[in-house]
Curated annotation (Swiss-Prot):
Subcellular location per the Swiss-Prot or TrEMBL entry: Cytoplasm
Keyword field: Cytoplasm, Gluconeogenesis, Glycolysis, Isomerase
An example molecular function term from Gene Ontology annotations: triose-phosphate isomerase activity
HAMAP family: TIM_B
Reaction(s) catalysed (UniProt annotation): D-glyceraldehyde 3-phosphate = dihydroxyacetone phosphate
The name this protein goes by in its record: Triosephosphate isomerase
Gene Ontology BP annotations: gluconeogenesis; glyceraldehyde-3-phosphate biosynthetic process; glycerol catabolic process; glycolytic process
Broad enzyme group: isomerase
Length: 251
């Protein structure tokens, strides 16, 4: 049985004061022991968050990593080996904001995926379609292509030590969300695509939903058979809301 996961992506938010307040709120939460829980702060707060969450079950990840695992001459970048040394456990790769706004292509994302795994960290591979692609009926084609890029490069076995997050781009930060049935349809298609390569891997890979998940809709979303938790954006910046989402995943 797949263990649920809830991961909070803090994105480019936080000051020293607000991060300290958020840590304090998270420490007070009654969190389920049956759920893997992670937060991904902006990198300059990584050490502060890891230290503040010591003694809790919450692990800390990163929102991005460089195209190479080791340190080197890449100004402004952070190597996955440095993230591992700092205490991170997982790293986002391919988030829609980096695909859409930064222009990261599959070739770059594959290098990051490999570097993250080479450093002993877990990549959280984000895939999803835009509103235009959904309206054109291209959802499954788009997410399938994004997933195929990794499988073609590394083989299905690379996903044994990875998490996949389906995030419909049109539902991120907009307040819109796919219905539980719509989200389940895509998650089921993703798992079916994986099963064509290896049924055992397909059944073991955790598929998170990442489109405006809130405490109010988490229970229904997480009740779907192929939704194994959530990649949480704005709601993860509120400790009480995030705690409620985590508890929903544990039900």
């Amino acid at each position: 049985m797949r263990r649920p996961m809830v991961a909070g992506n803090w994105k480019m938010h936080g000051t020293r004061a607000s991060v300290a307040e958020l840590i304090e709120g998270l420490v007070k939460q009654a969190l389920p022991g049956s759920v893997d829980i992670a937060v991904m702060p902006a990198s300059l707060f990584t050490s502060r968050v890891i230290e503040g969450l010591q003694g809790t079950s919450i692990i800390v990840g990163a929102q991005d990593a460089a195209i190479q695992a080791e340190q080197g001459a890449l100004t402004g970048e952070i190597a996955s080996s440095q993230l591992a040394d700092a205490g991170c456990k997982l790293v986002l790769v391919g988030h829609s904001e980096r695909r859409q706004l930064i222009g990261e292509q599959d070739e770059v994302l594959n290098k990051k995926f490999a570097a993250i795994q080479a450093s002993g960290l877990t990549p959280v591979l984000c895939i999803g379609e835009t509103l235009e692609e959904r309206k054109a009926g291209q959802t499954l084609e788009v997410v399938g292509r994004q997933l195929d890029s990794v499988i073609a490069e590394f083989g299905i076995g690379a996903l044994v030590n990875a998490v996949i997050a389906y995030e419909p781009v049109w539902a991120i930060g907009t307040g819109l969300t796919a219905s539980p049935q719509e989200a389940q349809e895509v998650h089921a298609a993703i798992r079916a695509q994986l099963a064509k390569e290896n049924a055992e891997v397909a059944q073991g890979v955790r598929l998170l939903y990442g489109g405006s998940v809130k405490a109010a809709n988490a229970v229904e979303l997480f009740s779907m058979p192929d939704i194994d938790g959530g990649l949480i954006g704005g709601a993860s910046l509120n400790a009480d809301e995030f705690g409620a989402i985590c508890r929903a995943a544990g039900n």
